Amino acid sequence: MIKVRVPDFSDKKFSDRWRYCVGTGRLGLALQKEYIETLKYVKENIDFKYIRGHGLLCDDVGIYREDVVGDEVKPFYNFTYIDRIFDSFLEIGIRPFVEIGFMPKKLASGTQTVFYWEGNVTPPKDYEKWSDLVKAVLHHFISRYGIEEVLKWPFEIWNEPNLKEFWKDADEKEYFKLYKVTAKAIKEVNENLKVGGPAICGGADYWIEDFLNFCYEENVPVDFVSRHATTSKQGEYTPHLIYQEIMPSEYMLNEFKTVREIIKNSHFPNLPFHITEYNTSYSPQNPVHDTPFNAAYIARILSEGGDYVDSFSYWTFSDVFEERDVPRSQFHGGFGLVALNMIPKPTFYTFKFFNAMGEEMLYRDEHMLVTRRDDGSVALIAWNEVMDKTENPDEDYEVEIPVRFRDVFIKRQLIDEEHGNPWGTWIHMGRPRYPSKEQVNTLREVAKPEIMTSQPVANDGYLNLKFKLGKNAVVLYELTERIDESSTYIGLDDSKINGY
C-alpha cells in the first residue's frame, strides 16, 4: 500500500509546456481528409499550440520549381499547396513550428533521399539560390498571414543532421554552413524572426556544443536550441515490425537535463530549449506505440519534462504517416496518438487527462501528480507503467486529498490493459489489416476510458481516496463541488422505483 497525504497549499506551478507542440507526418499529408479531421479532434481534446513536421520544401508540396527560358534557368515559387496546409492549421487554431527542409530535387547537389516519399538530404548545389528560396518563402508567409502572426512561428533548420540518413555524410561543417546561410536569410527578411537548431537526435550532444560555439565565433543568429529524444535500444527487425527494449523514463529526463546544462554553460546560457521530437521508440513500426504501456510510460515525461525544457513535442499526433511506406495495417506500431480510422490510442488519453490538470501543483512523485484548478477543484493523475513481465503488477494507493468543499463529486477515468485499449481488442479480432466498418466502430467504442462516479463527503477538509492501479494503468480523478438540487423536485422519492 502506497500512502500519500497531499498538502493543502503549494507555491509550485505545473507547467503546460508538454502541449506547446506536437509532431506530424510530412506536411503534404495535410492535404488528406482524415489527417485534417484527426488534427481537429486532437486540437479539441488536447489543445496543442504548435505543429511541426518534415517536408516543407520537398517536391510533393511543390514550392520550388524551375522554368527554362531560352538558355536561362529561372526559379519559380509555387505556394498553392503550402497555403492550403497552413491555412488549415491556422483555421484549426494551431500554428506551424516550421522545419526548413528537405532539399528540393532541382536545387539538390546529390540524389540521396530518405523515407518512402524520398526527401532529398543533400546540401544545395547553389547556396545563393537556396538563400533566395528561403527569403521568398518567408516573404510569402508574411504577405499572406501578416508579420505579427509569422513572428510567433519558430523556424528550425533541417532535421537530425548528425545522422547520415538525414544529412549527407552527417557532415557537421556543411550543416553549419547551411545553418549560417539559412539563418542569415531569415534575419534578412525580419531580424525578429526566431531561428534555431541543430535538431539532432540523441547520442551526439557534442553537436550542440559545437553548434553554439560556431554561432558565437561566426556571429550567426540563434534564438533557440532544438533536439530529439527517444528511449529505445537497437531492435529486432522483421519485415513489418521492430521490437526494441525501452529504457526507463529517467533516461529521457536525464537527456533533457544534460542538454539544458550544455546550454547554461555556453555563450548563450538563456536560450530556449525545444525537444522537437520525442517518443519511446524512433521507429514507426514498433507496436509499443499502440499499447497501454506507452500511455503509462509517457505520463512521467509529461509530468516532469517541463522542468527542464521550454517545450517537448510528441512525435506524432496521427498514424496518417508514411516514412516507411503507406501503413500496412490498422495497428502497425505507428507513432500517432490517434490510429488510422480516427481511433484514439491509450496514449491519447494520457494527454487528454493531463489537459484536465490545474496550475497549482500540490503534489508530485514518479507515479502521481495532484493539482488544484482555478475554481478550487482538484485533479489527480496516477500511472503504473510495468517495465518487465511480473505476476503481481498491481499497486494499491491510499491518498488523502485536500478539498475546499464538504460535498464532493468524483469522476474517475481509467485506461489500462482492459479499458481504453483498442489495440488489445484488435488482437482479439485476429489483427485485421483493413477492418470493416463494423470492426472500426467496435474499436472506437472500446477506445474510450472506463468512467465511474461517486459522491463522498469530505471531513475536516480532506477526502480519503483508495484505489488500485493494474498493469499499465493511467487514472484521472477529478474532485469538484457537488451542488445538490434534489430538494427542488416536488414529491421526489427514488424508493418508489421498482428495485430501488
UniProtKB/Swiss-Prot annotation:
Catalysed reaction equations from the record: Hydrolysis of (1->4)-beta-D-xylans, to remove successive D-xylose residues from the non-reducing termini
Keyword match Methyltransferase: no
Induction: By xylan and xylose.
Top EC class for this record: hydrolase
Keyword hit for ATP-binding: no
GO molecular function, one term: xylan 1,4-beta-xylosidase activity
UniProt keyword annotations, A-Z: Carbohydrate metabolism, Glycosidase, Hydrolase, Polysaccharide degradation, Xylan degradation
Gene3D superfamilies linked: Glycosidases (3.20.20.80), Glycosyl hydrolase domain, family 39 (2.60.40.1500)
UniProt cross-references to SUPFAM superfamilies, sorted A to Z: (Trans)glycosidases, Glycosyl hydrolase domain
Gene Ontology biological process terms in this record: xylan catabolic process
Highest taxon, organism lineage: Bacteria
Active site: E160 (proton donor), E277 (nucleophile)
Xref: InterPro entries: GH39_as, GH39_cat, Glyco_hydro_39, Glycoside_hydrolase_SF, Glycosyl_Hydrolase_39
Summary of temperature dependence: Optimum temperature is 70 degrees Celsius. Loses activity at 85 degrees Celsius.
Biological function: Has hydrolytic activity towards xylopentaose, xylotriose, xylobiose and P-nitrophenyl-beta-D-xylopyranoside, but has no activity toward xylan.
Protein name: Beta-xylosidase
Organism encoding this protein: Thermoanaerobacterium saccharolyticum
